[in-house]
Amino acid sequence: MNTMEAKHQKCFGPAFVEEWGLELYRHRVLDLWNNINLYSDLRGINRFQGLYVTLAYVNANITPVGDLEPLKRWLDVTEKCSNAALIRYMEDDDSPILQKTLHWSQKASELILTMPISERCPFAGVEETLSYASEFCDIVVVSSANSDAVSEEWERYGLSYYTSLVLSQNAGSKEYCIGQFLEMGYEKSKVLMVGDGLDDLEAARNQGVLFYPITIRRETECWDRLQNFALDSFLDGRYAGDYANKLIYEMESALSSDYET
């Protein structure tokens, strides 16, 4: 879905500035938020993980934002990074940082639901690719986003018709979800994960499955290539190797390790 930029620029980032009272540094903090969550090698990480990285950077380089340790402890022990998991954890630890984190996440989710439909649509070529792939493959959505938003977006555009299952943040990590499907009997060489972030790549590699990258700012081109060449290459058993590595290198090169530019 072509929603990530709009969600971060208009929902997650502004809600972050508001929740932590960072109006004095608004422009710098919003740029920082976008660089970390959209354009860095952390692109695609869960909202709570992105929040912690951003808070830690702000705390060290811009202005104090309070004790971050309770948030770090939760992220270290939780199996699922979701509002529901955080609420359960807060039954034993309702530290101020966790209260603010939950309020920020809920506010961001509310803002996402108010986004214009024009800003929550698929990239060109996605439906055609899914339609073609569904003739030969079981398609499963594995997302780190909020479950309500994921389901609503995929159903609105009829994309869920092509899928066998839609999983979101409360199903567990992407790596965990892939592992569950492998336990159902899918051969690793016959599983292709499609993603646009290094967390997607890491999840695929850790589970030993193949990976097809969607490179930022070249999304339409990547979806077209998947439909017209890479998918057939995968189905024929020719995708792994130099060709896949070349595409992955292109995606990695498009992401920065600098949080402020």
Predicted regions and their residues:
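C-terminal cap/substrate-recognition subdomain and adjoining C-terminal extension
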Residues: 118-138, 145-261
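Catalytic P-loop NTPase motifs of RecA-like helicase/translocase cores
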Residues: 1-2, 201
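Alpha-helical substrate-recognition element adjacent to the catalytic core
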Residues: 2-151, 242
